[in-house]
Design a protein with these regions (language model features):
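Glycine-rich phosphate/diphosphate-binding loops that line cofactor/substrate pockets in enzymes
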Residues: 1-2
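Glycine-rich phosphate-binding loops that contact phosphosugars or nucleotide phosphates
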Residues: 5-144
């Protein structure tokens, strides 16, 4: 265990790829994302699009992992279902969402970050800044802890 799993849809999936690489390369923390076309199409075909991320978590997550789920609206059913699966598995979950303050994803994680906006670009860029800031914080802790 002890890796970070990052998932999102569309622009949030691109962000998941970027931040997973940053966690691994810059912060020295093993991180993966679920953006492989064969994984998405196989699991979505076999389990339904709303369930493919939770099924990927079942297959790839280990005890002690941290799951980061990103959805601008906070209403993406595959992200919500993944949050519930992560909870069942005892994994720590961080969610990143926007739009309505009471969106379902925001209610589903251990740590929930919400952007008070209804503009996709503002929400996505804020999520990106926050996620990169987490990596920078970890790097700072590593570099300055000695």
């Amino acid at each position: 265990g002890r890796k970070v799993i990052v998932a999102g849809n569309g622009g949030s999936a691109a962000m998941a790829s970027h931040v997973a690489v940053d966690f691994t390369k810059a912060a020295g923390i093993r991180a993966i994302n679920f953006n492989e076309a064969d994984l998405i199409t196989c699991f979505a075909n076999d389990y339904g699009f709303e369930h493919w991320v939770e099924k990927a978590l079942e297959a790839y997550a280990d005890e002690g992992d941290v799951v980061i789920l990103i959805s601008s609206s906070g209403k993406s059913k595959n992200m919500i279902n993944a949050a519930h699966q992560a909870k069942k598995m005892g994994l720590s979950t961080m969610t990143f969402s926007g739009f309505e303050s009471n969106n379902p994803l925001r209610q589903s994680g251990n740590f929930n970050f919400w952007v008070d906006s209804k503009e996709y670009n503002i929400i996505e860029m804020t999520h990106h800044i926050w996620l990169v800031a987490v990596v920078d914080y970890i790097i700072g802790k590593i570099e300055y802890s000695a």
